[in-house]
Amino acid sequence: MKPDLYICHTAYQVLVEACRAFEAPCPPALVLSAALPGAEVLAERLRATGLFAGVRVFDEEKCGNAFQKGFWRTLLLQRVIGRRNVEKYYGFSLDGTQYRDIYIHNDWSVLGRYLQDKGLRYILCEDTFASTCADGGHQLIQRQRALPHFALRQAFGYGYLYWGDWKKVKAIETESIEKATVPFARERLLQRCQKAAFSALTKEQKALLSSVFITTPLPADTAGAVLLLTRDFVSEGLMDEETQRRMYKAVAAKHCSGGPLFIKAHPRDASDYAALFPGAVVLDRTMPSEVLNFALPFRFAKAVTVESTVLKAFEAADEKVSLTLDEALAEARA
């Protein structure tokens, strides 16, 4: 039987595909984008599980730019150059005939464009939890469809189309067909309830996933433990590093007492929280926060975050505190 191929750009996506691999009839192959922080180290831990037939890391920044200007150059050269950049210059190739199904979460990436360059059908998966069911109108898809001659572009494969609009997308996964808000016909949607997949994990499977994602030694006494989940406002241009440090110190002082402090930084947040909070347990920032729902031998008394949706699917805390950015900054000024 042919294996499946999973392509991941975030640690959450790796978690999703590891859960899928438990159900696979034969070990699947996995490709990790080097855009994922610590991709090589994570790849080694994944190989050690024996869950995958192979784990490769793909550095998309080394593949150059295939985009062309002008109608004829785009029509005749863009896909040829895209394949050449990946296969000849970077030395990476995929043979679609070797796989039963190809699953990818971010088809706007170099790897997604490479699949389109080769005409390989794929299943588009949710890039974050229940993203196909989110409110907001899915503006990226709507703006793409508002481009001139969209129907012709889609019919004849002119240029690249993302987020499920490419004509050879086999299916679009959703947490719930009933609750899906993406603008696609229902028959194009494929339901996979990730919440149910997490709940169905066995004790042994949870332990295996913990060995991949939980790399920080845990304290013996976790009574009253509090979890602070950060967001990197500095990289978003919303404040400077010093303001962010003061803000999180103030938030922790007010909301994170009563037990050991755990810090789970956003994957893009490179701040040194071990220095900011001496004695705190700083978890691997690349770890999906969803892992904490099942991987720890205890529950948190409280989980705290600022201007983030991370607590929406978080189930490992008795109390959840979600502050607005204005509220957190006001506490820093108090």
Regions found by a protein language model. Name each.
Residues C256-T286:
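Catalytic donor nucleotide-activated moiety binding site of glycosyltransferases and closely related
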Residues D221-E236:
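Conserved donor-binding/catalytic core segment of Leloir-type glycosyltransferases
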Residues S289-R333:
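A donor-sugar binding/catalytic signature common to diverse glycosyltransferases
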Residues M1-L5:
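Extreme N-terminal starter segment of soluble prokaryotic enzymes
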Residues Q139-G224:
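A nucleotide-sugar donor-handling region in carbohydrate enzymes
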Residues I7-Y162, V310-K312:
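Active-site and donor-binding regions of nucleotide-sugar-utilizing enzymes
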Residues V55-D59, V281-M287, L323-T324:
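Short acidic-hydrophobic, aromatic-tinged amphipathic segments that line or gate anion-handling sites
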Residues K118-R121, G259, D318-V321:
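A short helix->loop->beta-strand "cap" motif at the edges of active sites that frequently abuts
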